[in-house]
Design a protein with these regions (language model features):
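HotDog/MaoC-like acyl-thioester-processing domains
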Residues: 1-20, 123, 127-183, 280-282, ...
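Non-catalytic linker/capping segments at the edges of enzyme domains
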Residues: 1-66, 159-229
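RNA-interacting cores
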Residues: 58, 68-71, 86, 169, ...
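DNA polymerase sliding clamps and clamp-related checkpoint/processivity subunits
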Residues: 65-77
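Alpha-helix N-cap/helix-initiation motif
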Residues: 71-74, 227, 231
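Short, structured motif recognition centered on aromatic/hydrophobic residues
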Residues: 76-89, 231-246
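One face of beta-strands
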Residues: 78-81, 109, 237-241, 265, ...
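Hydrophobic beta-strand-centered segment that forms part of the acyl-chain substrate-binding groove
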Residues: 86-132, 244-286
């Protein structure tokens, strides 16, 4: 489903998202996530994996009122870890060549958080299992494989579009999970949201995505598409649009807010998009409510996101955040 604001009353247009949320260098979904470090100690079996993951945030990962915030395991962390492990499992199962591994594409991601945000990040338990493989005519390479990863109480399902037949003319890729995208290349990409256009009547915002990347050759996962928008790009952009919508609902300044918690998120990206100068993203709150929890007021919302010109691309997420003290529910 493609959302747009055509024919709707526009309430406000803000040139740069930084003018609303603050400098991207001080925001997690701006540049802060790129400063996170991961140490993965994973053991692989036939179609599964288990181990421990350490996630280290710098103190300046996200700042509000010049103070650092306490981090929790984010959707970005969950995707990067689960994506890395899912690729490693599929490479082993199908004995993919280096070329086959680099052109395999992450088509779908679904992330569900536990009952509470996970803040103990020194030794997060990981388990992963290849669930199933199916043939698909509506895919790039004819085969879709689903892998489920658990990070403590968080669950992540990744669907990868890939070739099923081993390419014996090519050397089999190393079975390490040291793919450049998951380790370093995601940090080299830059997304900026401009011309942020608000329609309060339907709780929606549309923004132009301006994208820059080095386009350098990459080895391992999705290395065949160095200029394409990747899952982290989509997740961080839609997360920022979610912040715009959530804060506007209660007329909040980001400096006054608590961390935004994505309770669940599902993203479908069926093929690589090599971006034009810009793409228009739209996010809308389909429903929202205020509730009381342990004496505090919380805003809950369900949002849908879309990409102009690509109706097959979509995002659905359930979000919440605690309102500042004094805001009634």
């Amino acid at each position: 489903m493609e959302l747009n604001l055509s024919g709707k009353e526009i309430n406000e247009v803000v040139t740069s998202i930084d003018d609303i949320l603050g400098p991207s260098e001080q925001r997690y979904f701006g540049e802060g996530y790129k400063r996170t470090q991961y140490e993965c100690n994973i053991n692989y079996d036939k179609d599964s994996a288990q181990g421990l993951v350490s996630v280290a945030y710098r103190t300046d990962w996200s700042q509000k009122k010049t103070q650092s915030r306490r981090p929790h395991l984010s959707t970005i962390d969950a995707f990067l870890i689960a994506g890395r492990v899912s690729y490693a499992i599929i490479k082993r199962h199908y004995k993919l060549s280096a070329h086959q591994s680099s052109q395999a594409w992450i088509r779908h991601v679904s992330i569900k958080a536990g009952a509470e945000a996970l803040e103990d990040l020194d030794a997060v338990r990981l388990s992963a299992q290849l669930l199933d493989t199916s043939s698909s005519q509506d895919s790039l390479f004819g085969t879709l494989t689903r892998v489920k990863t658990k990070l403590d109480s968080m669950e992540i399902e990744v669907i990868i579009d890939h070739e099923a037949e081993a390419d014996h003319s090519q050397s089999v890729v190393s079975f390490s999970d040291d793919d450049e995208y998951f380790n370093s290349d995601f940090r080299l990409r830059h997304c900026h949201l401009a011309n942020n256009t608000f329609c309060d009547a339907i709780c929606a915002v549309s923004s132009d995505l301006l994208f820059q990347c080095p386009g350098k050759p990459s080895t391992g996962a999705m290395g065949h598409y160095p200029n394409a928008l990747m899952m982290v790009d989509w997740l961080t952009c839609f997360a920022q649009l979610s912040q715009l919508v959530m804060y506007r609902l209660d007329k909040l300044d980001r400096n006054e807010t608590h961390n935004l918690w994505m309770r669940s998120v599902t993203v479908t990206t069926p093929y690589p998009i090599i971006p034009r100068r810009k793409h228009t993203l739209t996010l809308r709150s389909m429903k929202n409510s205020l509730v009381k929890k342990k004496g505090s007021s919380w805003r809950l919302a369900t949002v849908n996101g879309s990409v102009s010109g690509h109706p097959e691309f979509n995002l659905t997420a359930k979000l919440c955040h605690q309102l500042p003290q004094g805001e009634p529910a």
